[in-house]
């Protein structure tokens, strides 16, 4: 089963790249295109969370890419897989937001690291908005911006001190 899903996830990553990435895109544009694809195609598993039980698949890239339902770590694992395939350095970050555990990513563009939280940029996180227009509140942000809402052990991750996109 792992091999079958591994191949299917890899195939989906390739399909995403083929559908949203153009040859002349900059890495910034690639990151934005994948961010937007995730928001338009993956639904936050709000209903399972509300019921008090989130199935393990919602925590995985498989959940995000094949089932198209995930929570934060599923979004983040899937985003990281696509970035790796595009050869854009990307880290999986764990921490919290408020009193709840949370996961997001860091990406490296032009030699500098930035935070990116696809989950929190998804406008249907509360299960009500069907617009699917991406937010950019947590798109390529510095640690100083992220620390206002996200808590993490900075020493475990690259420094994100560029304020270029803040």
Predicted regions and their residues:
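Low-complexity, Gly/Ser/Thr/Pro-rich intrinsically disordered linker/tail segments
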Residues: 129-166
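Secondary-structure boundary elements
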Residues: 3-64
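Short, solvent-exposed positions on alpha-helices
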Residues: 28-32, 73, 114
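Hydrophobic/aromatic-rich core segments of domains that either
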Residues: 74-144
């Amino acid at each position: 089963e792992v091999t079958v899903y591994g191949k299917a996830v890899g195939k989906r990553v390739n399909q995403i790249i083929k559908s949203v990435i153009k040859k002349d895109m900059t890495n910034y544009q690639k990151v934005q295109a994948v961010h937007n694809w995730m928001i338009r195609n993956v639904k936050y598993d709000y209903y399972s969370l509300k019921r008090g039980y989130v199935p393990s698949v919602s925590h995985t890239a498989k959940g995000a890419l094949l089932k198209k339902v995930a929570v934060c770590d599923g979004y983040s694992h899937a985003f990281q897989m696509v970035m790796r395939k595009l050869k854009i350095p990307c880290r999986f970050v764990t921490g919290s937001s408020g009193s709840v555990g949370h996961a997001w990513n860091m990406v490296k563009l032009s030699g500098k690291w930035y935070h990116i939280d696809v989950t929190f940029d998804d406008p249907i996180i509360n299960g009500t908005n069907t617009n699917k227009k991406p937010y950019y509140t947590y798109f390529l942000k510095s640690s100083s911006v992220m620390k206002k809402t996200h808590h993490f052990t900075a020493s475990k991750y690259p420094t994100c001190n560029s304020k270029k996109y803040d």
